[in-house]
């Protein structure tokens, strides 16, 4: 009898061990990884259509369900149904109130330097928990080069490096460059950034009880949204900061990818520097952002007249960065791109024929590279506005308004894709369904 019991126990132990091993292997394969120059998910190459949904991490904090939790769930269902499976989210804002002439988004994760309102991360918890139910992936940026969520300028303000007369007023471009460039040499600023990053990396989701570092819903951590050296004198400190933060993240989280959140040449004005910082062993993939309006690829509101030039320069910009990814043997993501509506209108009812054509061209790159197992591995259009609409008679966002995809300093409706933009969704859906269908067939 004892031999039979012992044999049964041994068999049971073997089965439990095998099941545990299988479960661990399945969990590991559900993380996005990089193999050679491709993303992999569940053992197959992962090419994707994604969206910038930065405010998705803030919706769960809204008191009104229609503007908050209900909206989040409805919009995630909508995105999934349209083939969008990858979302870029803000981790948390720094500071509150007016900065650089605008009211920043919030509530802040770090209201004052070194003080954290950890309940603000409940919003990110909810977004990740709901995304997991829909098999979606998140890219999370840990801070911001720009002021609309506080970002680097707020760290500098806390440490006395923003002159009194410049703390809230709208800065000139040269003033902003001069101020933000000091971040990389400001030791207390960087220490506060590191504390916030470490807090986020150490978080356990209150909804599904998963540690962030063990949650396969997260695809990647991003150092910041569009970190730039801003001035030549800051380049070496900037280079060290990128390497130090990428190493810090990898030391605390072995499961997730790391990227910088970079625009490309326009973020450094030096393609060699762009290549060098992305060559870092702790940086897993490259990104570029493409902004025809901001970079004056068309004049004023003359989008139709300048559209041929927009396409030409976009193709050239992608072509400029693709060889860098090829030399480094890493994936490249077109992480932001956008274009105004026809006639440069902010009205959600205005047509989007030029935007649709522009999206179709960029989406085609991902499809082509997916078919050829190439380096361009995904995209995130800027930006998803979902069910929100700009407030009538009001150009810019105000506290209490529903978030669209356009940050507070930009006209609401400028680059946002609303759920009502059916012609745009037709273009997005075709590629999104094609790529997600291909993954399903391979699994």
What would you call each of these model-derived segments?
Residues 18-25:
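Boundary at the C-terminal end of the N-terminal hydrophobic targeting segment
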Residues 27-297, 306-331, 337-435, 439:
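Active-site mouth of glycoside hydrolases
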Residues 441-443:
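Short, solvent-exposed mixed-charge patches
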Residues 7-17:
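Bacterial N-terminal signal peptides
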Residues 1-4:
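Positively charged n-region of N-terminal signal peptides that target proteins for export
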Residues 299-301:
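Acidic, serine/threonine/proline-rich low-complexity intrinsically disordered regions
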């Amino acid at each position: 009898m004892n031999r039979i019991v012992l044999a049964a126990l041994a068999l049971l132990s073997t089965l439990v061990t095998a099941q545990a091993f299988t479960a661990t292997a399945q969990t590991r394969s559900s993380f996005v990884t990089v193999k050679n120059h491709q993303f992999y998910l569940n053992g197959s190459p992962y090419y994707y259509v994604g969206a910038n949904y930065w405010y998705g991490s803030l919706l769960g904090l809204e008191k009104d369900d229609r503007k908050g939790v209900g909206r989040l769930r409805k919009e995630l269902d909508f995105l999934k149904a349209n083939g969008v499976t990858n979302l870029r989210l803000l981790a948390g804002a720094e500071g509150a109130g007016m900065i650089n002439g605008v009211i920043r988004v919030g509530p802040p994760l770090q209201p004052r330097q070194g003080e954290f309102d950890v309940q603000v991360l409940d919003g990110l918890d909810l977004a990740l928990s709901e995304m997991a139910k829909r098999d979606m992936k998140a890219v999370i940026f840990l801070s911001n080069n720009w002021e609309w969520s506080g970002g680097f300028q707020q760290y500098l303000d806390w440490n006395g490096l923003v002159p009194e007369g410049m703390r809230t007023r709208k800065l000139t471009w040269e003033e902003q460059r001069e101020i933000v460039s000091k971040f990389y040499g400001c030791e207390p600023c960087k220490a506060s950034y590191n504390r916030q990053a470490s807090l986020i990396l150490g978080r356990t989701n209150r909804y599904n009880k998963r540690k962030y570092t063990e949650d396969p819903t997260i695809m990647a951590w991003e150092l910041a949204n569009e970190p730039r050296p801003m001035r030549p004198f800051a380049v070496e400190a900037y280079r060290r900061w990128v390497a130090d933060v990428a190493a810090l993240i990898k030391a605390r989280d072995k499961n997730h990818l790391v990227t910088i959140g970079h625009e490309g040449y326009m973020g450094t004005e030096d393609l060699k520097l762009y290549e060098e910082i992305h060559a870092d062993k702790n940086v897993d993939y490259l990104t570029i952002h493409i902004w025809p309006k901001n970079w004056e690829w068309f004049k004023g509101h003359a989008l139709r007249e300048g559209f041929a030039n927009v396409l030409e320069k976009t193709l050239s910009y992608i072509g400029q960065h693709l060889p860098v990814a090829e030399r480094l043997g890493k994936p490249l993501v077109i992480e932001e791109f956008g274009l105004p509506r026809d006639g440069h209108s902010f009205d959600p009812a205005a047509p989007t024929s030029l935007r649709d054509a522009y999206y179709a061209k960029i989406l085609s790159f991902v499809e082509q590279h997916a078919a050829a197992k190439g380096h361009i591995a995904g995209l995130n259009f800027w930006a998803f506005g979902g069910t929100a609409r700009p407030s009538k008679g009001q150009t810019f966002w105000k506290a209490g308004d529903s978030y669209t995809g356009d940050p507070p300093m930009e006209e609401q409706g400028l680059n946002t894709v609303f759920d009502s933009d059916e012609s745009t969704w037709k273009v997005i859906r075709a590629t999104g369904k094609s790529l997600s269908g291909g993954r399903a067939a391979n699994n």
